[in-house]
């Protein structure tokens, strides 16, 4: 199952570094391998001939090089006979466990030659064959000498997709003494399952309490309990791994209802509801949708032409998505004329076209504002630059109302008027506003929150002992429920204003929220994470993906009008790493944050091509995140 094409774990199949965590038992490298070096030794067919001539048991193991840590996907009967491990006990694990003495050992045995293990790692890193001998252990703890021939297998695109290991096992003349806590020969007595003994070892005899994998209490649970109480709490990646453990779990993980629960628990109800509104996503199915949105294997650009018109022509408008519709409000017309009209583009239509929305009580015209969508079809506009200067007013519009009407929200204690700020929404009811440009060009660094569903909404400034440098043109994204991520913008740096690539996060669920510098180029001691980060920019596009990841592209980059390269960051990682995402198709020449929105959780819509000062809003680019939406 191709679940992590970006993982760097493929190189660890044979290495087996000692770690402090208990998971090390599960991390075994190619159990064999020996002191002979690797490299381009003879043809693999010689090993096949040797296997046929061998008088002793010969193991055959195949691992998936595209999965993290190269899990085993096949072992033959010879492997089972020689090692004492059954196939269902080792599938999904890395072969490194053979370097540990017994099924409960957590570290590589000290007699295993570390130089040989290092040589195996080097061969895997270089994509070359390996031949050699290495000490391994049977399940009962007795030593084996493994003469291993390891070879990479290439796919059609010259990428290593699998590793195949042929193992000739012989008894090793090593006196290790008895295995500590070894199992008795007495048959295992069945234990009736109760909630109290679920996490306890199953007794194997009087005075014994060794866990017996053959009679795991987990499998005494019903399918319903396994799905609803255990599997549904795992991440999509974990479900994909669990499905390879045994036939029963494989069949359970084929269930679409289970996948929906997994997606909802991992991504949140709001994201799941948005995905349910996309017809193409429904046809794809939750299992495949989870895979494609996790691996981004199907991401692609395409260009569309739509009908209708947005007139008069304008720039510096704001756009957002309501279901599968794109809504455009306001903008800057000829001679800096502020606009206050509303247009809708329905992407569900067979022939999408821009349509002017007849609304009542339109807000004052503006540009440099933000437009966001709350629960359902409720739009909210904040701030911007109007005919009389900067604004700090709030208006809402129910797009699905019989007679759509803009309604002003008279919030108490509003923030100072501003433009080119950034905003995002929380819980479908709250508007978060950050930074921007105030009167006389002063940059701001404050953060405010407003619950627009309250009878008497009150603006609340989020207190923080330290704030990032003041800025405009940055992006704000929500992940992990109530965490927000700030990226880029034009930031104050002493007397200067410089484009930024800094990343800051804040958890609004904390009793005393505070800003934390995740990474960046301009913060003392911050440094950049591993990988090539995006160049500093402002007015870029930030696409929030299910699971908390953020895609960055476009905007104003030093020396360029826009940058089409996509960058991916997962702020939930222990050490967040920027990754470059290469996407097929033709990207837009220009992409700006104020004119791009995410539709249905499966695609980002970039509005308009720009020719000089003219915006062509009948030309749009679509970044599809799932294959069936193209």
From Swiss-Prot:
Cross-referenced PANTHER family: ADAGIO PROTEIN 1, BACTERIOOPSIN TRANSCRIPTIONAL ACTIVATOR
Similarity comment: family membership: Belongs to the ADAGIO family.
One GO cellular component, as annotated: nucleus
Keyword Repeat assigned: yes
Compartment(s): Nucleus
UniProt-recorded name of the protein: Adagio-like protein 1
Keyword Flavoprotein on entry: yes
Modified residues (S-4a-FMN cysteine): 95
Pfam families named in the record: F-box-like, Kelch_2, Kelch_KLHDC2_KLHL20_DRC7, PAS_9
One Gene Ontology term from the biological process aspect of the record: protein ubiquitination
Record-linked InterPro entries: F-box-like_dom_sf, F-box_dom, Gal_Oxase/kelch_b-propeller, Kelch-typ_b-propeller, Kelch_2, PAS, PAS-like_dom_sf
Single GO MF descriptor: photoreceptor activity
């Amino acid at each position: 199952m191709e679940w992590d094409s970006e993982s760097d774990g493929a190189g660890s199949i044979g290495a087996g570094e000692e770690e402090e965590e208990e998971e090390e038992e599960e991390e075994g490298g190619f159990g064999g391998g020996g002191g002979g070096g690797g490299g381009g030794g003879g043809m693999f067919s010689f090993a096949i001939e040797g296997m046929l001539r061998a008088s002793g048991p010969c193991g055959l193991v195949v691992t998936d090089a595209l999965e993290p840590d190269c899990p085993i996907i096949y072992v033959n009967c010879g492997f089972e006979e020689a090692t004492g491990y059954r196939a269902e006990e080792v599938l999904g694990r890395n072969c490194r466990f053979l370097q540990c003495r017994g099924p409960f050992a957590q570290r590589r045995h000290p007699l295993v030659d570390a130089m040989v293990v290092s040589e195996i790692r080097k061969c895997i890193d270089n994509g070359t064959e390996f031949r050699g001998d290495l000490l391994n252990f049977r399940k009962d703890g007795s030593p084996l000498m493994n003469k291993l021939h390891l070879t990479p297998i290439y796919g059609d695109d010259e990428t290593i997709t699998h590793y195949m290991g042929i193992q000739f096992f012989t008894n090793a003349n090593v006196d290790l003494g008895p295995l500590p806590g070894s199992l008795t020969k007495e048959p295992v007595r069945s234990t009736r399952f109760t909630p109290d003994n679920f996490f306890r070892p199953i007794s194997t005899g009087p005075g014994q309490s060794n866990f017996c994998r053959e009679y795991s209490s987990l499998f005494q649970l019903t399918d319903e309990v396994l799905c609803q109480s255990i599997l549904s709490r795992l991440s999509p990646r974990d479900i994909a791994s669990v499905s390879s453990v045994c036939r029963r779990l494989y069949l359970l993980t084929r269930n679409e209802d289970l996948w929906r629960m997994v997606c909802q628990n991992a991504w949140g109800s709001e994201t799941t509801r948005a995905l349910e509104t996309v017809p193409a996503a429904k046809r794809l199915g939750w299992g495949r949708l989870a895979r494609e949105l996790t691996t981004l294997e199907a991401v692609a650009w395409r260009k569309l032409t739509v009908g209708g018109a947005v007139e008069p022509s304008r720039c510096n408008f704001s756009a957002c998505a309501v279901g599968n519709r794109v809504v455009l409000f306001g903008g800057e017309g000829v001679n800096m004329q502020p606009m206050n009209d509303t247009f809708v583009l329905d992407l569900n239509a067979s022939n999408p076209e821009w349509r002017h929305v007849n609304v009542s009580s339109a807000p004052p015209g503006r540009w440099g504002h933000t437009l966001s969508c709350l629960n359902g079809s409720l739009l909210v506009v904040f701030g911007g630059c109007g005919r009389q200067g900067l604004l700090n007013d709030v208006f809402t519009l129910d797009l699905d109302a019989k007679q759509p009407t803009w309604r002003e929200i008279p919030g108490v204690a509003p923030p100072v008027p501003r433009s080119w700020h950034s905003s995002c929404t929380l819980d479908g009811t709250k508007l978060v506003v950050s930074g921007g440009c105030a009167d006389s060009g002063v940059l701001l660094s404050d953060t405010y929150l407003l619950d627009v569903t309250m009878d008497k909404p009150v603006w609340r400034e989020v207190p923080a002992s330290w704030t990032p440098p003041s800025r405009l043109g940055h992006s704000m994204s929500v992940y992990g429920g109530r965490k927000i991520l700030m990226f880029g913008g034009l930031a104050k740096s002493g007397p200067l204003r410089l484009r930024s690539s800094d990343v800051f996060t804040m958890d609004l669920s904390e009793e005393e929220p505070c800003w934390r510098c995740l990474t960046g180029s301009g913060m003392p001691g911050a440094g950049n994470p591993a990988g090539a980060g995006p160049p500093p920019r402002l007015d870029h596009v930030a696409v929030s993906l299910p699971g908390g990841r953020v895609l960055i592209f476009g905007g104003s980059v030093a020396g360029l009008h826009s940058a089409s390269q996509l960058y991916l960051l997962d702020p939930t990682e222990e050490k967040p790493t920027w990754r470059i995402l290469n996407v097929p198709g033709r990207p837009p020449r220009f992409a700006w944050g104020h004119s791009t929105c995410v539709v249905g959780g499966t695609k980002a819509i970039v509005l308009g091509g720009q020719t000089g000062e003219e915006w062509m809003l009948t030309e749009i680019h679509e970044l599809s995140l799932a294959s069936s939406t193209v």
